[in-house]
Structures are given as structure tokens and as C-alpha cells.
Amino acid sequence: MKYFGMPMGMWGLFSGSFRAQLRTVFGYDADEARRIAKAAKPRYRQIIAELPEFEAADRFKMNEVNCAMLGAFVLSMPQRPEVEPLTRFYADAMMTKPMRWFCRKSGKNKFSAKDLAAMRQTEALKAADRNPYSWNMDLYEYPDGSGYEARFTCCGICALMKKLGLYDLTPAIWASRSMTARRCSSRS
């Protein structure tokens, strides 16, 4: 995957909050947090460079880019974190002002006809059949029309975390995504 575009933008958007959360959650001083962030950037670029390009219709590219950033920071820390503090670190680092705006905006369309159509397209795409760092999912629409469930059968985050030797920390990403979703829905 090319660094320019979304990966570079995500680094610009989130690296400062990642650095701040190194201090808040893990107790690193400002110099150590700066050192970790400085070491994480070339690692992040390397991780991104080793990922294949995502298809234009693949809606999960951002998830993989964010996972790459978290992995780069973890691999740059002097001590491997535990899942629980890493969960808080990632959730807090991702919940920036622009992300809160994005959550409010996207939350207004959840379960709409347009959202459901996009989910059907995602299910049909089966992008992980061609890219091991993407996702495949099965969509289960509720018979009463009240919503749906997406059950993932292939997980790009799991694949990348295994590659990075961080698979045991994968629950931190999923738990933090749930925390972020709750924060987003409570602010909508």
C-alpha cells in the first residue's frame, strides 16, 4: 500500500493523540513519548508498505491503517503493554475532535436504506478472498426490518496482528472499537 493518501493523513490526524496517550495511560514522560512516536513513524511506513493495496470498494482500509499505527507504536514501546491498558490507550487516542465529528455524521445514517445497501455490497465483495488483510462478512438482516448483524468470517486486523507478532493484543482493538462506538452513539 502506498503511504501517501489515507495512511499519511491518518498519521497526521492521530499521531499527536497517540503520543499524548502514551503519557496519560502508560505514564511515559514527554521525552520518552516523543522517542516512541519518532521510532513508530518509520515502522508504520514499513508496515503500510508491506500491505497490498485495497480495492476501491473495500470499506475496511481505514481499520487496517489504524491497526498498523497501533502496531507501530506498540513495537516501539520499551515494554510490551497488557491488553487492558492498551484498550484504553487506543480508544482514547482515536477519540479526537475530528473523530467525534465523523462519528456523529456517520451515526445519523446507521441502519438507513443507504447504509443497508452498502452493507449488502460489502458482503458481496468478499474482499478477503483477494486480500488477506481485508474482511469477509455475512450480513443477517432482521426479519422485522429493525436492523442487521454483520458477522465477520475473515478479519484483516487479526491477520496483521499475527504478522506483527501482536496477535495476543488483538482484543484491545476490538474492545476499544466497542468503547469508541459507545462514545459516538452517546454523543449523537
Q: Where is each model-derived feature located?
A:
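Active-site-proximal segments of catalytic enzyme domains
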Residues: 178-180
